[in-house]
Amino acid sequence: MLLVTGATGFIGSHLSKNIKSARYVVLNKNECSFADTYHVDSINGSTPWSGAFHGIDAIVHLAGVAHRNNPSSYGYKEVNTEGTIQLANEAVKAGVKRFVFVSSIGVNGTSTQAKPFSLDSEPSPHNDYARSKYDAEIGLKKIAKETGLEVVIVRPTLVYGPDAPGNFGMLTKLIKRLPVLPFGLATNRRDFISVQNLTALLVTCATHPNAAGHTFLASDSETVSIKEFTNAIAKGLGKKVFQLPVPLTLMRLAGKLTGKSAMIEQLYGNLEVDSSNIKEVLGWTPPFTMEQSMAFLKHTDK
């Protein structure tokens, strides 16, 4: 049986649909409808986990503080690093065999230039959030070496899907309201992963015997521009959009004037990953194409 943290979050709520038997860690302040739950007040370096592991073979650790929550640098460290290490150490004591840690592609950096990020790329966490995830990875590898805990690390690219937060949620709302977008001249190259594909991968990482000890850079394996990506969102929503040919220089100027420079760079920058080792190690390929994944937007659109 699996123990899933972050069960009420965006990815966790979708993961629960792919699992037959699991126990879900839920913060006491959150309501949920899961049959088997373990409640905690918070996740940090002193969280008590003594009653969480009965019958548990593997953990999928999704819970954490994201950059959109805007905590202090210590807030990231307290939850994302110290909380992860505490959970892993307590899991080892209870005899749990495997720990799947959902990290971030931000561990590798903000963008790619000549070639995609790969397992050979030097980590370059660019902010406190990414650093906290990277430090957690280092701590987990140390625990694995010392105890034999089977650690699997997954670094997803931007995760999209129904009710996704962040830039994807913003783009979806924009497309619903306005049939005109400014990405007509965009030729950048970015990798993404749908929440359907990511959750399927996480289940595989928790159960496949070959996954232990590996790090995976997770994507749909479909590299697209922001123009192509927003066209795919529109198609998934059953909408039609017109892409205005706005030069990047003008978009960057608009970003500076509105305080949205970082968002503009995220939308127009390149971020490619080499996900080939997932197929090589696990024999796994994404079950959904981007078009198929985007179709779920219309099914859940209200």
What name fits each language-model region?
Residues 2-20:
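N-terminal Rossmann NAD(P)H-binding glycine-rich loop of SDR-like oxidoreductase domains
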Residues 42-82, 86, 90, 105-110:
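NAD(P)H-binding glycine-rich loop region in Rossmannoid oxidoreductase-like domains
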Residues 78, 113-160, 180:
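Catalytic helix-loop patch of NAD(P)-dependent Rossmann-fold dehydrogenases
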Residues 86-128:
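Conserved Rossmann-fold NAD(P)-dependent oxidoreductase catalytic core, especially the SDR/UDP-sugar
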Residues 161, 183-189, 216-223, 232-238, ...:
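Glycine-rich Rossmann NAD(P)(H)-binding loop
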Residues 164-170, 183-206, 213-214:
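Substrate-positioning beta->alpha
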Residues 204, 208-261, 291, 295-298:
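Mid/C-terminal beta-alpha module of Rossmann-like enzyme folds, strongest
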Residues 262-302:
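C-terminal amphipathic/interface module of NAD(P)-dependent oxidoreductases
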